């Protein structure tokens, strides 16, 4: 099993992040290969993968029959199959569910621990990578392949890159950027995903939410025109009958502790506090600010005040870098 690890440090907000190499050990890789790969994955996820090019990656969801997400997947093509990235805590259970009908198809579904995941973000990340790779991804070509590496481009919260690569390439990059780049662990990438409004589904929240409750429709992760997939009826009903009353929100402020995924929050109601929502992810930045990603009612007032349960500090809503208007 290939593995990289960098010493932890408090993450920084994207606006003041120095050039940083990030070991994505809290994320994991999986693959589907075989002649039926596209047909099989098309029947299991919310996006229309038949429309995907080799230069695209997208966030999609793998749901149960009730339309609740086992996980969300960062999906892209590789040769005749597909690769996806998801939180390590959900991979085993998600793959078990995905394999349930695979006996009837010519596919092989497997975890991939031979490669490693590296984030490159912060000040002049593109320039740093341009010294190593001949071609870099961008908004037009979001996926680029270079030797043993596949590079994925992300726009939000600021330009950053995710490398699916081998340990030798990571060691080479670390050596080449020694003295220029800081090193950090998964918490830094988590902070950037929270800022970007990209839903983080860990084991505590697997099987809890329909995709729209995590804004996946605003991120291009749901096709309402494709054929059948597991959970489609419930996902479609949420859209066409207005059944979804929840959305993903970004909160920032202070707290005396970092809450866990699956915890609720408290909403201020006059002089009282009422429990609300479910936390998907939270992290504390190097300036002491707490970032929280939570699923809550989609009709909240933007001036609403929240807190971690029983805490003396407060949290406020921060705008996401995309619109929920359809």
From Swiss-Prot:
The keyword Ubl conjugation does not apply. Signal peptide: none annotated. Keywords: Cytoplasm, Folate-binding, tRNA processing. HAMAP family: tRNA_modifying_YgfZ (MF_01175). Belongs to the tRNA-modifying YgfZ family. Folate-binding protein involved in regulating the level of ATP-DnaA and in the modification of some tRNAs. It is probably a key factor in regulatory networks that act via tRNA modification, such as initiation of chromosomal replication. This is tRNA-modifying protein YgfZ. It comes from Salmonella arizonae (strain ATCC BAA-731 / CDC346-86 / RSK2980).
């Amino acid at each position: 099993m290939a593995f990289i690890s960098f010493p932890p440090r408090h993450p920084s907000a994207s606006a003041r992040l120095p050039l940083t190499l990030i070991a994505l050990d809290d994320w994991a890789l999986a693959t589907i290969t075989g002649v039926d790969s596209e047909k099989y994955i098309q029947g299991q996820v919310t996006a229309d993968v038949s429309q995907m090019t080799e230069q695209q990656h997208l966030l999609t969801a793998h749901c149960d029959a009730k339309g609740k997400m086992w996980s969300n997947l960062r999906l892209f093509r590789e040769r005749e199959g597909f690769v996806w990235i998801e939180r390590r805590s959900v991979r085993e259970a998600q793959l078990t569910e995905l394999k349930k009908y695979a006996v009837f198809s010519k596919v092989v579904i497997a975890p991939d621990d031979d490669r490693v995941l590296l984030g490159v973000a912060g000040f002049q990340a593109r320039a740093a990578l341009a010294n190593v790779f001949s071609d870099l991804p961008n908004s037009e070509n979001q996926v680029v392949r270079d030797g043993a590496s596949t590079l994925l481009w992300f726009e939000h919260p600021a330009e950053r890159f995710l490398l699916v690569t081998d340990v030798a390439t990571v060691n080479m990059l670390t050596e080449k950027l020694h003295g220029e780049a800081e090193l950090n662990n998964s918490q830094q990438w988590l902070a950037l995903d929270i800022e970007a409004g990209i839903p983080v589904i860990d084991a505590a929240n697997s099987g809890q939410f329909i995709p729209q409750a995590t804004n996946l429709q605003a991120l291009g992760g749901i096709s309402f025109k494709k054929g059948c997939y597991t959970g489609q009826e419930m996902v479609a009903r949420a859209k066409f009958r207005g059944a979804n009353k929840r959305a993903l929100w970004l909160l920032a402020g202070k707290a005396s502790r970092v809450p866990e995924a699956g915890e609720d929050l408290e909403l201020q109601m006059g002089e009282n506090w009422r429990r609300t929502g479910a936390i998907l992810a939270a992290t504390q930045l190097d300036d002491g600010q707490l970032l929280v990603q939570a699923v809550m009612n989609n009709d909240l007032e933007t001036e609403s005040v929240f807190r971690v349960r029983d805490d003396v500090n407060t949290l406020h809503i921060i705008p996401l870098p995309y619109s929920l208007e359809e």
